[in-house]
Amino acid sequence: MPSQLEALRRHTTVVADTGDFETMRALRPTDATTNPSLILKAVQQAAYRPLLDQVARDHRGAPLAEITDRLLVAFGRQILDIVPGRVSTEVDARLSFDTRATIERARSLIALYEAAGVARERVLIKIASTWEGIQAARLLQQEGIRCNLTLLFSLVQAAACAEAGVQLISPFVGRIYDWHKKAAGAQWNEAQQSGVNDPGVQSVARIFAYYKAYGVATEVMGASFRNTGQILALAGCDLLTISPELLARLDATEGEVPLSLSEPLPGAALPKALPSGEIAFRSLLNEDAMASEKLAEGIRLFVGDAQRLDDLLRAAGAY
């Protein structure tokens, strides 16, 4: 009998969600994703600290933003030596509400990758799913820079990303689950709210169904998992990005994995189309307390980790 990881691969592209590229080798993911928190975690390990020190030393005196991007690209290049597919590298979360600055930073990251001999087709630029971020992605896609819209918690964000023609979205399963569990308090029933009844799983399933019903080409990559049950309940999603710990657990567990998500049947009723435009986006997002709160919280967390990464680079003598 196959492992659950092997069985999952029959339905879904498996992506490693980590900056720890050495851990990836045994798990053989197709793609990999990184973010400021994962890179910060990696460079605090003895195995990866020399990479930070080398980048800081080689580019001492350059603007701190450039040195940070060079560190992200250094990790990305190492990852691309391991995975056959793509790596996602994130634009500084401090630019989440600045369309022009996001575009400029994304261009800079792609230029660094291309200067290192990496084709832009192997890189996804991660951008927070704010209105400003989505508009930046719209223009970047037109330039051939493929984007991964992250910190996505709602169908309204997903619909705006589809309309903008982005390459891929990353709806966050675990953080949606966290919000609903906290909101329910003592009324939360873990057994009843697991698997296909998990609110995070249901959110991704709705987005997936909406995209497939309307023929949206944007890829859906479920992210931010708390347990393997959430992962297995989304078998059939275009991609799933999974932490090394949960990948190892799937690899160590035997069992078939049934298909959970699939294309709609011919003639199936279309879900209600969401209105487009900035006013509708901001209004509908504002009405969704969970999505509004988790988007703001996610940006704050990534900004905090970006600042801590800056501090490490300064301590290493980069600036």
Swiss-Prot record:
GO terms for biological process: carbohydrate metabolic process; pentose-phosphate shunt. The active site is at K126. One of its GO terms (cellular component) is cytoplasm. Its main location: cytoplasm. Gene3D superfamilies: Aldolase class I (3.20.20.70). Its EC number is 2.2.1.2. It comes from the Bacteria. Disulfide bonds: none annotated. Keywords: Cytoplasm, Pentose shunt, Schiff base, Transferase. It is found in: Cytoplasm. GO terms for molecular function: transaldolase activity. It catalyses: D-sedoheptulose 7-phosphate + D-glyceraldehyde 3-phosphate = D-erythrose 4-phosphate + beta-D-fructose 6-phosphate. PANTHER family: TRANSALDOLASE (PTHR10683:SF18). This is Transaldolase. It comes from Bordetella avium (strain 197N).
